């Protein structure tokens, strides 16, 4: 244990242990007992208040009298009882503040407005300060420096407002299930710094609007020209195309030369056109019953247009290009997942001999899931389990759940036993980011954080893109029959 085995945010917990040590030294863990036994000077320098009666309890080591009376002890001896009472009140307020701040980090996603259809967030009891026996008025009196190290000269009220904006906006974060505390701390720092949520510049907003217009225009053209033909529209989750654009760009920044995509039928035609670069003519050939030249095809299979695979290249802002492979999709939902993992792993190898090295940054796997399928298909769990195995890991997969809040005709309440479609990933300690599909800039922020995390830890990350389905399951569907 370090000489100071806690940071400022855990000072209230350390103080409570110190109070217990003063009454019963054997009642605290051995490592803490060793720290407290260093003496009042060491504990005072660490920022703790020396409990009354510590010298009389006979616990711990004996301390030399000369030269070690801490400033806090001296102040306590000379202070009036009212001042001592005020100090203890302050200590309790700091404890309440740290608990309330932790509640934002752990449960803020339950107040986030991630549903574009406007459902009320469920909330959580700990997101009300009264749960901890305090109030906003009491907390607002505290300086932020009592709770946050390196805090600016501002009140805790300002910090709490910033935390609410960070954790309870149109992005919700779930990190509390992650086992590695250093990873959790890193994620907190990313969220609270706001680096990934910086507003877009005007030019970037114009390009985002242009991209969304292209996505919508293709869907509307196909809907008009081929009325009633199945295409499994992406409408309601249109933002996934700009999200993939950004994922490609962010991957290239850290050395990626290729991205391997896997997805089911929903939105596949738009991905073929705007991410892989398959021409509109090739897509319309499929609607006309003519085989597209640019797709992966096998003679005699009769595979449908929204199952075709393809490959292409996308130009990046810096003038370079990145190669994109969209794996062919079987009709069995999510079965493509381990195939994409294997393709990515193989492409990461630099050679074929025993000395060949694998570069996880060179090739990135991105999987797009359906909400019902992610929760319900066993192959999803099997693939997630490969994520950290030495023989199989592709160095981190970016998962995007197209969460349109319905599985064919089944509502979430009838299709899964968990609150979120992404909850399966909690068992693997992967970070989860929920985001409102109707907030384009928030969606890009989610991708930005996911790609930075993947580059930092070479680990899987989940984006739960909460949208909706504008039409029926497919465009030939009559909702009054299939969803009465």
What residue ranges belong to the model's regions?
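Active-site pocket-lining segments that scaffold enzyme catalytic pockets across diverse folds
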Residues: 217, 221-281
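Structural motif corresponding to the C-terminal cap of alpha-helices
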Residues: 216, 220, 251-255, 343-351, ...
